[in-house]
């Protein structure tokens, strides 16, 4: 009798697993344990604040690439890495860094500082190889300030290890779904955002298929509570000309019982704030998840113990559904 009971339970579980839709399989793979692991590594003191062009951000890039490879995500090109250089023409330290495919050649006589950086780019090829969706977040932060007396490391747990964790989990969720998307979907990790959106700007400047990108989904700071009375509050920016982006989230929250409380902010010209600006300026529709500022913004006190893990997981699930729509919906 016991054998029959065990067999019945096994058959039932097998049926339930088989009955799950690809989207549900992807959602099920998103969890707090992974968020804690990814953010914990990226925001560790050993990464020295992940300043673009320096050791910590290079370690972060290698870590992210190794995870993409382990998941089975292909590199976008011959490598997961897209190297680029930024330059500063002014002699003063405060001079703005610039990026251009031929920047050093063009401004060679005027360059007084050069930084070498790397974006990390992976792709799941779609059935329709002529269209793209991109999911991205910046991997860099502010590094170290030796002038500070106590904590000198800007760990950047919320800004933006939290966003990187979401992109990684979404990439894994697409693999877990077991279904090839209709469009190519790129998973992008930008370097140099804190120095002027350098990595995303370089990508857009050099992208041969920019007009074929149907949408860009951005994450920048998704782990804190700026409204204690609303712990699941999140700001949801999206291109106003694409009302489907707002409709999707409203429908998905209801359908999948997500506990987010979005502040919907359609934006007629979303060219500021984060890496979404690089794409919006090129005419690409955008979505941007953001949980607003807080007292630890751009401070050494931006640590993992202050994150709302439940919110990070819920945002990641909601945004996976956004990405699924970007990659699979015929029209929007």
Model regions and ranges:
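N-terminal capping segment at the start of a domain
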Residues: 22-24, 29-59, 71-81, 85, ...
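Structural recognition of the beta-strand scaffold that forms the well-ordered cores
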Residues: 39-43, 82, 119-121, 132-136, ...
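His/Asp/Glu-rich mid-to-C-terminal helical/loop segments that flank catalytic regions of hydrolases
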Residues: 176, 293-332
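Metal-dependent peptidase/peptidase-like ectodomains
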Residues: 190-291
């Amino acid at each position: 009798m016991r054998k029959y009971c065990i067999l019945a339970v096994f058959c039932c579980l097998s049926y339930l697993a088989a009955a799950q839709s690809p989207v549900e399989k992807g959602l099920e793979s998103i969890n707090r344990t992974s968020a804690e692991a990814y953010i914990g590594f990226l925001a560790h003191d050993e990464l020295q604040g992940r300043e673009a062009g320096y050791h910590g951000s290079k370690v972060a890039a290698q870590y992210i690439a190794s995870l993409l490879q382990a998941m089975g995500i292909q590199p976008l090109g011959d490598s997961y890495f897209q190297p680029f250089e930024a330059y500063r023409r002014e002699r003063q330290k405060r001079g703005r860094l610039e990026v251009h495919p031929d920047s050093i050649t063009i401004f060679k006589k005027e360059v007084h500082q050069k930084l070498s950086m790397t974006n990390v780019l992976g792709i799941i090829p779609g059935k329709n190889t002529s269209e793209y969706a991109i999911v991205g977040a910046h991997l860099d932060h502010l590094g170290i300030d030796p002038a500070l007396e106590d904590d000198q490391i800007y760990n950047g747990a919320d800004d933006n290890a939290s966003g990187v964790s979401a992109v990684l989990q979404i990439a894994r969720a697409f693999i877990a779904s077991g279904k090839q998307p209709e469009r190519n979907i790129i998973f992008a990790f930008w370097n140099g955002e804190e120095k002027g959106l350098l990595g995303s700007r370089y990508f857009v400047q050099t992208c041969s298929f920019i007009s074929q990108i149907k949408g860009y989904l951005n994450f920048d700071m998704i782990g804190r509570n700026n409204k204690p009375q609303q712990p699941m509050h999140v700001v949801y920016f999206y291109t106003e000309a694409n009302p489907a982006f707002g409709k999707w989230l409203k429908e998905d929250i209801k359908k999948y019982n997500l506990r987010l409380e979005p502040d919907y902010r359609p934006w007629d010209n979303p060219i500021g704030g984060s890496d979404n600006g690089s794409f919006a300026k090129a005419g690409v529709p955008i979505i941007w998840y953001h949980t607003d500022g807080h007292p630890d913004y751009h401070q050494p006190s931006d640590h993992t113990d202050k994150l709302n893990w439940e919110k990070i997981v819920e945002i990641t699930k909601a945004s996976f559904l956004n990405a699924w729509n970007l990659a699979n919906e015929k029209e929007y």
